[in-house]
Amino acid sequence: MNSLKDGNHTALTGFILLGLTDDPILRVILFMIILSGNLSIIILIRISSQLHHPMYFFLSHLAFADMAYSSSVTPNMLVNFLVERNTVSYLGCAIQLGSAAFFATVECVLLAAMAYDRFVAICSPLLYSTKMSTQVSVQLLLVVYIAGFLIAVSYTTSFYFLLFCGPNQVNHFFCDFAPLLELSCSDISVSTVVLSFSSGSIIVVTVCVIAVCYIYILITILKMRSTEGHHKAFSTCTSHLTVVTLFYGTITFIYVMPNFSYSTDQNKVVSVLYTVVIPMLNPLIYSLRNKEIKGALKRELVRKILSHDACYFSRTSNNDIT
């Protein structure tokens, strides 16, 4: 974008990000933990036939969304450190903003789809294979990504309608919309309403779906006579509810509450939760609380160890013969 004169102002061609932390080692460690944890979940679900169910199909895409969400923010921080700069171009800022909005929405709607999956599994177990067939799962996933695309378009379009005259220092570690609005010298009322409505709609709809699903799940669990049934049903929902509480709490604070109700520094701290901390914790939450994932991980590790030992003994035997 070329510099354009507007009265006594000059349109900005880029922004300076004030950053999250000056410790490059911490940046690398956090990013590698996020990548390795979520990538491990995806690979485990793909290679383990015991996990080829709709629940884990959605979980693998949740891990992908976490990984991609963090990757849309963190690598830029690392590159800026390596070249000793904290700048991002106008186009780069728009891409980063749209990517973050896309994957945040994908995670929102995925959590609702996972709640529906748990609802069908617990409340209608005999019809589960029909109601959550491969075709239905793919259709739900298509809705997830379409919703993400629409929200991303609304964010990037609103961004391009803003005029930035200076200063260009963004008090954030990535191009989030709230700190960008503070730098705009144009009317932000329409953009604020549009984005609050679009983000709020996604949050309200998905929260309602999750709430209704869990109300029916709770009613079904309370009707169960078996203590073992109670424990099994609750254990399958605990990890999902934990992730839902963490994620929706942070994004509601950022994207739904009015900007004047919190400071930019508070915005930055809360943003760390959903861009860094939550993507890092999600694999741990689902792994530690899910017996099927722990069992699949143990089976794959044992299989790898046994196959390695078999190859070793085979080579040893061949050497002895020769």
Curated annotation (Swiss-Prot):
CDD domains according to UniProt: 7tmA_OR5P-like
Tissues where this protein is expressed: Expressed in the tongue.
Membrane topology reported for the UniProt record: Multi-pass membrane protein
Top-rank lineage group of the source organism: Eukaryota
GO CC list: plasma membrane
Keyword tags: Cell membrane, Disulfide bond, G-protein coupled receptor, Glycoprotein, Membrane, Olfaction, Receptor, Sensory transduction, Transducer, Transmembrane, Transmembrane helix
Residue ranges, Cytoplasmic side: 43-50, 117-135, 214-233, 289-322
Residues passing through the membrane, by range: 29-42, 51-71, 96-116, 136-156, 193-213, 234-254, 268-288
Protein location: Cell membrane
InterPro entries: GPCR_Rhodpsn, GPCR_Rhodpsn_7TM, Olfact_rcpt
Main location (coarse class): membrane
PANTHER family in UniProt: OLFACTORY RECEPTOR (PTHR48018)
Similarity field: Belongs to the G-protein coupled receptor 1 family.
Protein name: Olfactory receptor 5P2
Gene: OR5P2
